[in-house]
């Protein structure tokens, strides 16, 4: 369900050493399955463990997950990264905003899942997003840009070198390309 890197496990063990005995961590999703979903990690003292919690055992501690959050934490990963700027705990949960769709689901559902779980989080750093309008009979994913991507001078590069390449790699033989139907209006909202 959740992968915790060795570095993150060591970090949690160090943090938990300063907590009362029996304290573990809790991994959770607030508003799971919605665009507002947010993931978090907190301390979980023994008296906060619920009877329906799922206990994931790691080296020196356990991660508690509430039953409601569990399906949205499938394929989640926690890492502790150190670089020149310092250290950072990262939690990636690709299914937090929407559940992963089955591999035999209709193409539009699978493409929408990739857009919401992988592409839009990347575009969000620029205040942008895309929406799947349709998939044509020819296999072209028709997209509409929003937010900071609308009117951005880099939208063609983002579309062809980023989004199209990623979608064609993920859906070979099913998608033949992407097209943009956005009426781009450059303004203060545009990223560049």
UniProtKB/Swiss-Prot annotation:
Its cofactor is [4Fe-4S] cluster. GO terms for biological process: iron-sulfur cluster assembly; protein maturation. Keywords: 4Fe-4S, Iron, Iron-sulfur, Metal-binding. Gene3D superfamilies: Fe-S cluster assembly (FSCA), HesB-like domain. GO terms for molecular function: 4 iron, 4 sulfur cluster binding; iron ion binding. SUPFAM superfamilies: Fe-S cluster assembly (FSCA) domain-like, HesB-like domain. Binds 1 [4Fe-4S] cluster per subunit. The cluster is presumably bound at the interface of two monomers. [4Fe-4S] cluster binds at residues 149, 152. InterPro entries: Fe/S_biogenesis_protein_NfuA (IPR017726), FeS_biogenesis (IPR000361), FSCA_dom_sf (IPR034904), HesB-like_dom_sf (IPR035903), NIF_FeS_clus_asmbl_NifU_C (IPR001075). Homodimer. NCBIfam families: PRK11190.1, YhgI_GntY. Involved in iron-sulfur cluster biogenesis. Binds a 4Fe-4S cluster, can transfer this cluster to apoproteins, and thereby intervenes in the maturation of Fe/S proteins. Could also act as a scaffold/chaperone for damaged Fe/S proteins. Belongs to the NfuA family. PANTHER family: FE_S BIOGENESIS PROTEIN NFUA, IRON-SULFUR CLUSTER SCAFFOLD PROTEIN NFU-RELATED. This is Fe/S biogenesis protein NfuA. It comes from Shewanella sp. (strain ANA-3). The gene is nfuA.
